[in-house]
Amino acid sequence: MSVFVSGANGFIAQHIVDLLLKEDYKVIGSARSQEKAENLTEAFGNNPKFSMEVVPDISKLDAFDHVFQKHGKDIKIVLHTASPFCFDITDSERDLLIPAVNGVKGILHSIKKYAADSVERVVLTSSYAAVFDMAKENDKSLTFNEESWNPATWESCQSDPVNAYCGSKKFAEKAAWEFLEENRDSVKFELTAVNPVYVFGPQMFDKDVKKHLNTSCELVNSLMHLSPEDKIPELFGGYIDVRDVAKAHLVAFQKRETIGQRLIVSEARFTMQDVLDILNEDFPVLKGNIPVGKPGSGATHNTLGATLDNKKSKKLLGFKFRNLKETIDDTASQILKFEGRI
């Protein structure tokens, strides 16, 4: 029995692969190029239980056909993590919306064609972006939970890259639930979505620390490189540690109770002030070199904006998430080691 992880070289996916291998699963991953595939198998020590396939372009509806033609009878679990996540785009529809939706439709059609009898569980890496209404995130009277959906339309979400990304996650997840509804008679798999908020935490491998990191971790990285007089970005939201997101993907297919559920993975709220407080307190090398802001004032973050209620998800998952201090400490220390500052 194998677990297939699409986009296995991604930030979250590498941690998923690590946990799967530690739990002795046989893992097949995909990446966009042979070079990325080889780099990842090497990073995992050429583990005999881990192999890679190349899927160059997930926006093509038959992109995953060859994977399931080759391994379909052996794959019981599919974790679809591959999706575009970048705000530096020129065409929202071409660069974000179509690849995200086609990636989901394509992989599910490939399962239907070549692994309808063998795949039992599918876990989709969605996002809190598919849940909340960006236009109303500052409305204190609102609560978003597992039943909530981003109200964006295909047209309205193309107003800017951030809205387009949020829309891409909504339409990709909707496509998955709709596919299952329409194909109940021809596939046996059950579906679960994992909807993380801002994902912080260390890279799986130190070698993957770069000058610029993936979008969420770059928020921490950029704070660490501000000057004391720089303005602190005004940002708040929910946070989760990447290692907890990875674990949530495993629990999502290991438990029967998670079938048909959307799992919002968020530990608590944060502001950039909270992150700065931790950086200044725990890293002497940063103290005096980055802004101080108003220490402790981040505590007001629970009064900011709409409420995120994920009590149901936390209960279903049944494990304790890491707190912000541990997450930021591990993220920052890895970056500082890479830079030779600690």
Curated annotation (Swiss-Prot):
Q: What is this protein called?
A: NADPH-dependent methylglyoxal reductase GRE2
Predominant place of localization: cytoplasm
- Residues where NADP(+) binds: 7-12, 32, 36, 57-58, 165, 169, 199, 216
Q: Origin organism of this chain?
A: Saccharomyces cerevisiae (strain ATCC 204508 / S288c) (Baker's yeast)
Q: Which residues carry this modification: Phosphoserine?
A: 333
Lineage of producing organism: Eukaryota, Fungi, Dikarya, Ascomycota, Saccharomycotina
Complexes and interactors: Monomer.
Sum up the protein's function in the record's words.
Catalyzes the irreversible reduction of the cytotoxic compound methylglyoxal (MG, 2-oxopropanal) to (S)-lactaldehyde as an alternative to detoxification of MG by glyoxalase I GLO1. MG is synthesized via a bypath of glycolysis from dihydroxyacetone phosphate and is believed to play a role in cell cycle regulation and stress adaptation. Also catalyzes the reduction of 3-methylbutanal to 3-methylbutanol. Acts as a suppressor of 3-methylbutanol-induced filamentation by modulating the levels of 3-methylbutanal, the signal to which cells respond by filamentation.
| Thermal dependence | Optimum temperature is 40 degrees Celsius for 3-chloro-1-phenyl-1-propanol reduction, and 54 degrees Celsius for 2,5-hexanedione reduction, and 30 degrees Celsius for the reverse reaction.
